[in-house]
Regions:
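Acidic Gly/Asp/Thr-rich repetitive segments characteristic of extracellular carbohydrate-active
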Residues: 102-140
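Extracellular/surface-exposed low-complexity repeats and stalk/linker segments enriched in Gly/Pro
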Residues: 1-27, 33, 48-59
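All-beta strand scaffolds that present successive hydrophobic residues in beta-strands
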Residues: 141, 159-163, 202-208, 229-233, ...
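Short hydrophobic/aromatic-rich beta-strand motifs
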Residues: 21-38, 119-126, 142
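Right-handed parallel beta-helix/beta-solenoid
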Residues: 13, 62-82, 88-118
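N-terminal extracellular ligand-recognition/capping segment immediately after the signal peptide
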Residues: 124-159, 163-175, 211-216
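Short glycine/acidic-rich loop motifs that flank beta-strands on beta-rich extracellular proteins
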Residues: 149-151, 165, 171-178, 215-221, ...
Length: 389
């Protein structure tokens, strides 16, 4: 067989920022990024360029500009650009990064691995590291049991989304902590550090579709110095299987507090289960516009305790105002369903109270008031139902 042509074979190596245009068929190695390229051009080629060869070091998601939203199941491809001929094209990496998962940051969710650092890292990187709006996105918690042995600090503007109560579970078991989860400012600072530096106090935090559980006797969710926050379709529980017969360490499932600097206001719970603790909810400090709607309070010494420790000084000058519990269910509560020691405009409306304030002896054994407004003005029970004979 006659030899028609012998082509020159040449390889180059160097750093990626000094990679020249390679000759047609010439191979170049970028030693710093460990990526390999081959030159393309000349007759028959659509353009002169360096093409990357896929290796174990290639970032396929970054280099693949192949995603275009279509939604073909509706019967036609959606138009994403100015016209059908110019669709919006994004890399797969950009598409996947639209939603962040705690597993992207190392959380496992197997109930055995300590996920504290991984979850706090995810919260910091997405919501606290840079105060740029476009960096924020929903933080997704796939179904699993996330063991935490330290305090989870949820910064301002965080949006946490699980796959439903008893499917996504955050489980805290460190008795030395002040809570399993606590709201933090925009720099992930808590307690006396809230608002220091350029930190914005806790605000517009959303938690949706998960269980937050304490396996030890500590508060479960601590909402402190916060404004305009929403907890939807969640279980917030301790570790009591039945209503405690004493206050114990007086820890609540939900603890809401203020300081002299920041008064908590406009906190909304919707369709949540709260209890299995000494108290379901403890509200002592000055605060206003606290609303529980469609919730289930169960297995507690008292379901909701309001304004017991009013001192006349900040942060507990007069106690909570405008606390409303509506369309909710109270069940297996040893003492009062609602006990307002101090506070104005406390309202219970259209709730049902089952086996409440009977010392767990059944509805024919009343021990105290189901609803007790001890002091304050403008407090009412409207349209409530009771199972007492």
């Amino acid at each position: 067989m006659a030899v028609v042509q012998i082509s020159r074979i040449q390889h180059r190596s160097g750093t990626s920022d000094n990679l020249p245009q390679l000759a047609r068929g010439e191979i170049g190695l970028a030693v710093d990024t460990r990526r390999v390229y081959i030159g393309n051009g000349g007759t028959g080629s659509p353009q002169t360029e360096n093409l990357e060869l896929l290796t174990s070091r290639s970032n396929i998601l970054e280099i693949s500009e192949s995603y275009t939203y279509k939604d073909a199941q509706i019967g036609f491809n959606a138009q994403t650009g100015l016209n059908a001929a110019s669709p919006i094209i994004r890399t797969l990496q950009e598409k996947i990064d639209d939603v962040a998962s705690v597993r992207d940051f190392g959380a496992v969710g197997d109930g055995e691995t300590d996920d504290t650092a991984a979850i706090n890292r995810a919260l910091y990187e997405i919501f606290a590291r840079e105060q740029i709006i476009r960096v924020r996105r929903m933080l997704y918690f796939p179904a699993g049991k996330y063991l935490v042995t330290g305090l989870l600090k949820i910064p301002s503007f965080a949006y946490l989304k699980g796959e439903g109560p008893d499917s996504t579970i955050i489980y805290g078991n460190d008795v030395t902590e002040n809570a399993v989860v606590q709201f933090a400012d925009s720099k992930q600072q808590v307690d006396a550090s809230v608002g220091s530096g350029t930190g914005l106090p806790p605000q517009f935090i959303v938690i949706d579709g998960m269980t937050i559980e304490a396996g030890v006797d500590i508060p479960v969710l601590h909402i402190d110095q916060a404004e305009s926050c929403y907890i939807n379709n969640c279980k917030i529980i301790g570790n009591s299987a039945s209503a405690p017969t004493a206050v114990g360490n007086s820890n609540p499932a939900v603890k809401i507090t203020s300081t002299a600097s920041y008064t908590t206001k406009h906190i909304n719970f919707k369709n949540c289960t709260i209890g299995k603790h000494s108290f379901g909810v403890n509200l002592d400090h000055d605060m206003n516009s606290i609303h529980f709607d469609g919730c289930n309070f169960e297995h507690a010494f008292k379901a909701i305790k309001i304004g017991e420790n009013v001192t006349g000084s900040a942060p507990a000058v007069t106690g909570p105002k405008s606390v409303k519990i509506t369309s909710s269910r109270f069940n297996d509560i040893y003492k009062q369903g609602m006990h307002a020691y101090n506070g104005d405009n406390i309202v219970s409306a259209y709730n049902i109270y089952i086996d409440v304030a009977n010392n767990s002896l059944g509805n024919g054994n009343a021990a105290t008031h189901v609803i007790d407004f001890a002091d304050g003005v403008g407090s009412f029970s409207i349209g409530d139902s009771f199972d007492r004979p």
